[in-house]
Design a protein with these regions (language model features):
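A conserved beta-strand->alpha-helix junction
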Residues: 10-33, 127-133
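Short acidic/polar active-site loop segments enriched in Thr and Asp
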Residues: 11, 66, 212
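Aromatic-residue hotspot detector
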Residues: 4, 22, 82, 160-161
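ATP-dependent adenylation/pyrophosphate-handling site
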Residues: 1-6, 14-17, 99, 202
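Conserved small/polar residues in nucleotide/adenosyl-binding loops
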Residues: 2-11, 219-226
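AMP-forming adenylation/ATP pyrophosphatase catalytic core
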Residues: 90, 94-102, 109-119, 127-131, ...
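Conserved beta-strand segments of alpha/beta enzyme cores
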Residues: 11-14, 94, 122
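Active-site adenylate/phosphate-handling loop in enzymes that bind or generate adenylated species
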Residues: 26-111, 115-119, 165-175, 179-182, ...
Length: 227
């Protein structure tokens, strides 16, 4: 996230599709290891960061770069996930973290929204629905707004993206048959698919029936609590 830089010089832009690698090398091993946080959170954000860091290092080596810059804030766990992964793979590379720079002008989500508005950058959400979201094939997490107040109920009508509020889900259930080989799913309802497509199929089926909603408070490594 380089929004807010006085000047952003772009030489090359890489858009890499690592979905299948994410599924095979991260999601499947984590599921097989029963890697769950607080008995219900399936680590959708946590498990994605090492793969991103790995690709960043590969591209940095390809380009002959001497540093990697990330847009994680100075409060959350992502800065730790990215930097430990990068340092494990490429200890010689310098890490640049603008959010921890005292001269960085954007210190909150509202600052970013104001910056975009002032510079004519369209945002696909309104200020009153500006949840902080992290989405990948495995999950979507939401933070911010009423979620930060334990006394308030989540506004599922505005919040949910991948699933349906339970009260709006069908009354009738739906049967799903899955086949596994060596602990890895290979088909859904008799249709053979690769893991990434199986996850997409199950997201659609589960979302239709209001499956997959959890609420969890977790502790940042820097002792911040987030709901």
């Amino acid at each position: 996230s380089l929004v807010g830089s006085e000047m952003c010089i772009r030489d090359r832009l890489y858009i890499e599709d690592i979905v299948d690698e994410f599924c095979d090398d991260y999601i499947v091993p984590c599921v097989q290891a029963n890697a769950v946080y607080e008995n219900k959170y399936l680590l959708g954000t946590s498990m994605a960061r090492p793969g991103i860091a790995k690709k960043l290092v590969e591209i940095a080596r390809k380009e002959g770069a001497t540093a990697i810059c990330h847009g994680a804030t100075g409060k959350g766990n992502d800065q730790i996930r990215f930097e430990l992964s990068i340092k494990a793979l490429a200890p010689d590379l310098k890490i640049i973290a603008p959010w921890r720079d005292s001269n960085w002008k954007l210190q909150s989500r509202q600052d970013e929204i104001d910056f975009c508005t002032a510079h004519g950058i369209h945002l696909p959400f309104s200020v009153d629905s500006s949840y902080s979201r992290d989405r990948n094939l495995w999950h979507i997490s939401h933070e911010g707004l009423e979620l930060e107040d334990p006394s308030l109920e989540p506004n599922y009508e505005h919040l949910l993206v991948l699933t349906t509020p339970p009260e709006k889900a069908p009354d009738e259930g739906e049967y799903v048959t899955m086949t596994f080989e060596k602990g890895v799913p290979v088909s859904v309802n008799g249709k053979k698919m690769k893991v990434s497509d199986i996850i997409r199929e199950l997201n659609t089926l589960g979302g239709k029936h209001g499956i997959g909603i959890i609420a969890v408070s977790y502790t940042h490594l820097r002792a911040h609590e987030t709901k």
